[in-house]
Curated annotation (Swiss-Prot):
It comes from Thermotoga maritima (strain ATCC 43589 / DSM 3109 / JCM 10099 / NBRC 100826 / MSB8). ATP binds at T29, L30, G31, P32, D86, G87, T88, T89, T90, G413, D479, A480, L481, D495. Forms a cylinder of 14 subunits composed of two heptameric rings stacked back-to-back. Interacts with the co-chaperonin GroES. It catalyses: ATP + H2O + a folded polypeptide = ADP + phosphate + an unfolded polypeptide. The lineage of its organism: Bacteria, Thermotogati, Thermotogota, Thermotogae, Thermotogales. This is Chaperonin GroEL. Its EC number is 5.6.1.7. InterPro entries: Chaperonin_Cpn60_CS, Cpn60/GroEL, Cpn60/GroEL/TCP-1, GroEL-like_apical_dom_sf, GROEL-like_equatorial_sf, TCP-1-like_intermed_sf. One of its GO terms (molecular function) is isomerase activity. Keywords: ATP-binding, Chaperone, Cytoplasm, Isomerase, Nucleotide-binding. GO terms for cellular component: GroEL-GroES complex. GO terms for biological process: chaperone cofactor-dependent protein refolding; protein refolding; response to heat.
Length: 538
């Protein structure tokens, strides 16, 4: 396939045109008064969104050289989205500002390699400054503010705060379609797994067709139970306490199942048997999770624990167990809180190590069950288009909130980036030559997001920057929604530090790469041969 090449200034200008086309489409969405973008779909209804990465991903330019620039900006947005889940528009605006200023200097004769070094040094100092001003989340209110800013909706902020309140920082929160027009949070308390009672004879509530065991003992084993003899000692001990018994095993059949059912019907021992969740190695891990949550032991040959030797201390305990036809919920496990924390930390470490998305999801699910439950945000809307847009905003806001939990929060509205210029000033003083110019490029770019937020809201960015910098309070900024100057923390205009940091680092990375580009190579489009038209008359 023949190639076409572009060199030097001509190549860089083509890249810049591509960057500008994507950035100009994305930056209209920035801030509380940012607008939406409508994207045509080859099938189904069009997508309406104000999410930077969704817009960038849809843009494919006709000119192949310009398209290379567009793809690089997509990379900025995608990388920021992958790392922090939000801040994609900010990252795009920063990248455009750095590229514009950088290309001016390259055209004037600056050395691109030295410019890149200067950019990297300045960004390093700015990131240190961002980390310095970040504060830990102080409670539900902060979580609601972070989510509300990300989703541009106080209602969504409250929903996410409610969900996080219920499941904790490590809990799993999923987003699903609602069958109604309402958007609400559904919560599954305790540890739930998809296995129900083996026999309907165990049912205690015939109306709901479920088994309810109050303060039961829980026997956990990875074996198949069929012979009753090894179990008689422990069954007798449990019967003497008058408490019910839940049996979780690979399978329960034959004599054991008959014995449990008969004793339940006679009223000697209220019990229920369920199959162990999962398969293979995952089953072993989940049984161990249940054992730690309830303070019991897994009766397993691998661990050298025989059924005959089981004592009441080896059984798990819980406040309540509900078993339906195909699900079991253990509420209020009596396990040691320290052991549960250690288990959660262990699963967290596994999540960080794994590269498989499926593995990551199953580990997060296990962690959530140990941490206390799963929250589902059910999203309702009048039309399919609105539903898609709303779900997208909620997913973004969730990611932003998790990022805030990780690295804390900073004043929002572009203020933190603007004030990080103070740290860059010191770098500029220390550097010289083209490296100094590189640091100045970052200095100038750091004011781009706040300018864009102001312009999208109909204000003059330069005037607002001057007024903000006249006040030494690091949290002092401009509320573009109300058109007022205020303390950003007090007003709840906050961003996750991780989002702000990632946006800056990714923008600088791509800007540096683009400035040091000298040649562009693309495939030559094939010339379509014209097919002869049919004669008008036969």
């Amino acid at each position: 396939m023949p190639k076409i090449l572009k060199f030097n200034e001509e190549a860089r200008r083509a890249l810049e045109r591509g960057v500008d086309k994507v950035a100009n489409a994305v930056k209209v969405t920035l801030g509380p008064k940012g607008r939406n973008v409508v994207i045509e779909k080859s099938w189904g209804s069009p997508t309406i969104t104000n999410d930077g990465v969704s817009i960038a991903k849809e843009i494919e330019l006709e000119d192949k050289f310009e398209n290379l620039g567009a793809q690089l900006v997509k990379e900025v947005a995608s990388k920021t989205n992958d790392v922090a889940g939000d801040g994609t528009t900010t990252a795009t605006v920063l990248a455009q500002a750095m590229i514009k200023e950088g290309l001016k200097n390259v055209a004037a004769g600056a050395n691109p390699i030295l410019l890149k070094r200067g950019i990297d040094k300045a960004v390093e100092k700015a990131v240190e400054e961002i980390k310095k001003v970040s504060k830990k989340l102080s409670g539900r209110e902060d979580i609601a503010h972070v989510a509300a800013i990300s989703a541009n909706s106080a209602e969504i902020g409250e929903l996410i705060a409610e969900a996080m309140d219920k499941v904790g920082e490590d809990g799993v929160i999923t987003v699903e379609d609602s069958k109604t027009l309402e958007t609400y949070v559904e919560f599954t308390e305790g540890m739930q797994f998809d296995r129900g009672y083996i026999s309907p004879y165990f049912v205690t509530d015939a109306e709901k067709m479920e088994v309810v065991l109050k303060e039961p003992f829980i026997l956990i084993t990875d074996r198949k139970l069929s012979a009753v003899k090894p179990l008689i000692p422990i069954l007798e001990k449990v019967a003497q306490t008058g408490k019910p018994l839940l049996v979780i095993a690979e399978d329960v059949e034959g004599e054991v199942l008959t014995t449990l059912v008969l004793n339940k019907l006679k009223g000697t021992l209220q019990s229920c048997a369920v199959k162990a969740p999962g398969f293979g190695e995952r089953r072993k891990a989940m049984l161990q999770d249940i054992a730690i949550l309830t303070g019991g032991q897994v009766a397993s040959e691998e661990l050298g624990i025989n059924l005959e030797d089981l004592t009441l201390e080896d059984l798990g305990r819980a406040d309540l167990v509900r078993v339906k036809k195909d699900e079991t919920i253990i509420i209020g496990g009596k396990g040691d809180p320290e052991a549960i924390k250690k288990r959660i930390a262990q699963i967290k470490a596994q999540i960080e190590e794994t590269t498989s998305e499926y593995e990551k999801e199953t580990l997060q699910e296990r962690m959530a069950k140990l941490a206390g439950g799963v929250a589902v945000i059910k999203v309702g809307a009048a039309t399919e288009t609105e539903l898609k847009e709303k779900k997208h905003r909620i997913e973004d806001a969730l990611s932003a909130t998790r990022a805030a939990v990780e690295e804390g929060i900073v004043p929002g509205g572009g203020v933190t980036l603007l004030r990080a210029r103070k740290a860059v000033e010191k770098v500029i003083e220390e550097l010289e030559g083209d490296e100094k110019i590189g640091a100045q490029i970052v200095y100038k770019a750091l004011s781009a997001p706040i300018k864009q937020i102001a312009e999208n809201a109909g204000y003059d960015g330069a005037v607002i920057i001057e007024k903000i910098l006249s006040n030494d309070d690091p949290a002092y900024g401009f509320d573009a929604l109300r058109g007022e100057y205020c303390n950003m923390f007090e007003r709840g205009i906050i961003d996750p530090a991780k989002v702000t940091r990632s946006a800056l680092q990714n923008a600088a990375s791509i800007a540096g790469m683009l400035l040091t580009t000298e040649v562009l190579i693309v495939e030559k489009p094939e010339e379509k041969k014209e097919t002869p038209s049919m004669p008008e008359e036969f």
